[in-house]
Amino acid sequence: LEHRRQRQMCIRDSIYDALEFRKFIATIVGEPALYEYADPLSSINVHYADEGQELGWHFDNSEFAITLLLQAPQSGGQFEYVRDLRDAEAGEMNFAGVAAVLDGEAVIERPTVTQGTLMLFRGRNAMHRVTPTIGRTTRILVVLAYNAEPGIALSEAARMTFFGRLG
């Protein structure tokens, strides 16, 4: 017999899809509602970064991400970002600002992120990256992606680029 405290739980059922959780996060970020990322591969991800691996400068397709650093690397793996660099909803891409970031001429924010840090982040308009990890300890990060509108998903081309498959 399985003890009731040892039952299997799924993060998608117990947290990600939970209406109460989405209402709570919506209140924090000042949105009337949040919707699941309508993408079969990108709504919940676990990122692993071994020594020397990094995630280059980019913007997210989803409006919001909740991240939890499960395991910090020995060194490196620093999360860096430039807040409100563009306004994708208004079609203002700020290519000059993007160039300044890539050329090392922008003011970069580097929050303190240690193992166990839970962070809410608006990645659609904030350019961000993770620097190369150093050491044998793998950086492990869980990402939950949400949007302020329903039905938003990665394009098929993006799914193939990131995951090598469509579903």
Regions found by a protein language model. Name each.
Residues 6, 63-65, 139-141:
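Broad gene-expression machinery/nucleic-acid interaction feature
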Residues 2, 56-58, 132-134:
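Short glycine-biased active-site loop of nucleotidyltransferases that positions the nucleotide triphosphate
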Residues 83-84, 89-167:
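Catalytic core of Fe(II)/2-oxoglutarate
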Residues 6, 58, 127-128:
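Histidine-centered active-site/metal-ligand motif
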Residues 13, 23-41, 45-118:
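Catalytic core of non-heme Fe(II) oxygenases with the double-stranded beta-helix
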Residues 1-11:
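Single conserved hydrophobic/aromatic residue that forms the stacking wall/gate
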